[in-house]
Amino acid sequence: IDTTDYRSITPGWILYNYPEVEFIIKLLRHTTCKESCDYCHTQLDVLHNLKTFFGYERFRTYESEPLQERAAQAAVKGKSLLAIFPTGGGKSLTFQLPALMAGHSVHGLTVVISPLQSLMKDQVDNLADRGITDAVTINGMLDPITRSLSIQRVQDGEASLLYISPEMLRSKTIEKILMARHVVRFVIDEAHCFS
């Protein structure tokens, strides 16, 4: 594992033979210790990373409640949550920021399940417009070369966000990819796609 490259991932054979390794790495790299710790401030603080990744000084509030920040912080802490925001209310940020943070700190992969291929493409394109190239989508609309490149980016640890449709969960290719990566969370974007 190349410790100087945040995209370096634990080899699949280690994950297969020693599955507890990822848990230990997560404990070591994803547990806050004290206020003065530089690592905790730069790697685990949601406000610091909001500025680093997205250039925002603060999260949105709703009727003076920091709901967006609470949702992002809960995800960073590994809690399961249900976040309901209005259209355009910043819901995507609540899973994208923790996904990027986990990608950098524990080489984790966040799988986002979304019913619309156009929405997946928009999400990946919007992140790319911000200079964030950690997201890919794998879906039936991709030409074979683009699909192959997306798969390779996930396998090589270059992607920390993978957008797929619910149907793709049945794909043997997707299953193989996910088994070889440390999946830190699944996000259901538009919960009605599982009804």
At which residue positions do the language-model features occur?
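Conserved helix/coil segment N-terminal to the catalytic DExD/H
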Residues: 100, 125, 142-185, 193-195
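Conserved helicase ATPase motor motifs in RecA-like P-loop NTPase domains
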Residues: 86-89, 190-194
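Short loop/turn elements that form and flank the Walker-type P-loop nucleotide-binding site
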Residues: 76-79, 105-107, 131-132, 155-158, ...
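Conserved pre-motif I regulatory segment
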Residues: 35-86
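N-terminal accessory nucleic-acid engagement/regulatory domains that precede
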Residues: 1-40
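Short, flexible loop segments at the rims of nucleotide/cofactor-binding pockets, characterized by
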Residues: 58-62, 87-89, 137-142, 162-164
